[in-house]
Amino acid sequence: EKQSAENGEEVKVLRFSAIPDEDTTAQKERFQPVADYLSKALGIDVEFVPSINYGASVEKFENNDVQLAWFGGVTGVQAMSRVEGARALVAGQKDLAFKSYFIANVSTGLEASEDFPAAIADLKFTYGSSSSTSGCIMPSHFIIENTGKTPMEFFKEKPGFSGAHDKTAMLVQDGSFQAGALSFGTYEKLVAAGKVDPEKCVKIWETPTYADYNMTAHPDLENTFGEGFLDKLQQALVDCQDEAALKALGREKLVKVNNETFSGIAAVMEKVKFD
């Protein structure tokens, strides 16, 4: 997008956002290093714009209020379907084999198993955001795959939506909900930080792997910064060795992907309904 400078010249700015998947109040602080890295690597102005929820990040992208976003699999597919020419550029190495954990409060008596935990049907269960790949859509897919029932048929009590992965873990740990599903990475990070006690908030099942997070770019960037800019942006992300930027994304390395990488998620989204 272009802004007018005081001298009348247009200042070109790349605006970047992200899904607020955890610690929703500290987004700008978290993602600023990514904006700083891209600004330096590409020699342009890059500004981080927070999103209040998952849906808002997709709306901003659709309206061209942001031209680059760190999406989950589901939000990425939504953005690609709404903006013709939108391109998934990179994912973390681990995003090509992402997984969800099903967790339960110790009081349920449920323990880790390789078998799908069918007993959660009777429990008070929470997802993360309804647009979360690892916190809702893929867990629901595996419920359907293992039981032949939609989540609304499977759970005796309507499931809750915490809005973010860390909130899911805390709500299950404190007993507000008896069980839940979340990103494996967030659970492991919270355990490592001592915020989640795995004896109280027990990992009971891990899903098979799927493709998830991605950095997706708006086609209008080529109008603003010139033809071939998306390739340059992709390369700058793949080349990123900036520790602060990679830490912000929770990734050790970024790898090239394309829209096809997420076709499996698109197919799952057609099947998972909460109506």
Locate each region found by the language model.
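Ligand-binding clefts/hinges and TM-proximal coupling segments of bilobed small-molecule sensing domains
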Residues: K124-E145, D231-D275
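Bilobed "Venus flytrap"/periplasmic-binding protein-like clamshell domains
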Residues: V11-S39, S51, A97-M170, D174, ...
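A ligand-binding cleft/hinge motif common to bilobed small-molecule-binding domains
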Residues: W70-V83, I144-E145, L171-P198
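Stable alpha-helical elements in mature extracytoplasmic
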Residues: R30, V34, N53, S57, ...
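Acidic, polar ligand-binding/catalytic clefts
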Residues: E59-A119
